[in-house]
Every structure is written in structure tokens, then in C-alpha cells.
Amino acid sequence: MIKSELVQRIAEHNPHLYQRDVENIVNAILDEIVAALARGDRVELRGFGAFSVKHRPARAGRNPRTGEHVPVDQKSVPFFKTGKEMRERLNRDNATSEANA
């Protein structure tokens, strides 16, 4: 699912909201998550999961084409850990679909 599909589904389930308003809300939520991560904060959505930033140290890498050793700078990468309720639902839904197969 892409963002536009998410917006469309939310708008369908909430006919009192205009689709452009739903899009603005979704964008605002995502912008706030990114801003919090940029500040170094952890974003926890209970039952869904938690977003955080992991810091990868600088290391020696290798160019796969030439085999040359190259330095790789340190970097920060986003990390998402699923919440307990999401894991349980995914496992329950997966078990149900496998039983029906």
C-alpha cells in the first residue's frame, strides 16, 4: 500500500472528511514522526510499534565492482520495532489464512 491508497481508504471510512483533509492529516503525522526522529526522540505508537534512530559507526567497505577498499562514513538509520498487538494480529491472521489454504 502506498500513501495515496492509505489516504483514500481513511477517507472512505470517514465520509465526513474530505480526502484532501485526510491527506493533510497523514502528511502532518508523518512530518511529526520524522521531526521527532531528527531530534533524536523515539516515537511510540502503542499497539502499533516504535520508531527510533540507530547510529551505524564508520567502517571499511569494499567496492563490489573493483574490489577497492573504501571508507564508509558513520550514518544514522531509521529503525521500526513492531508492537506486541501488531505481532499478535499478524501471526493470528497468518495462521488463519494458512489454515484456509
UniProtKB/Swiss-Prot annotation:
Q: One biological-process term from Gene Ontology?
A: regulation of translation
Its lineage opens with:
Bacteria, Pseudomonadati, Pseudomonadota, Alphaproteobacteria, Hyphomicrobiales
- List GO terms (cellular component aspect): chromosome; cytosol
Q: Which InterPro entries match?
A: Hist_DNA-bd, Histone-like_DNA-bd_CS, IHF-like_DNA-bd_dom_sf, IHF_beta
The molecular function terms in GO held by this entry are: DNA binding; structural constituent of chromatin
- Check the record and name the PANTHER family matching this protein: DNA-BINDING PROTEIN HU, INTEGRATION HOST FACTOR SUBUNIT BETA
Region annotated Disordered sits at 57-76
Read off the PROSITE patterns from this record.
HISTONE_LIKE
Please describe the quaternary structure of this protein: Heterodimer of an alpha and a beta chain.
Please name every pair of cysteines joined by a disulfide bond in this record.
none
Q: Native species of this protein?
A: Nitrobacter winogradskyi (strain ATCC 25391 / DSM 10237 / CIP 104748 / NCIMB 11846 / Nb-255)
One Pfam family of this chain: Bac_DNA_binding
Role noted for this protein = This protein is one of the two subunits of integration host factor, a specific DNA-binding protein that functions in genetic recombination as well as in transcriptional and translational control.
Family indicated by similarity: Belongs to the bacterial histone-like protein family.
Q: What is this protein called?
A: Integration host factor subunit beta
Which SUPFAM superfamilies does the protein's record reference?
A: IHF-like DNA-binding proteins
Q: Keyword set for this entry?
A: DNA recombination, DNA-binding, Transcription, Transcription regulation, Translation regulation
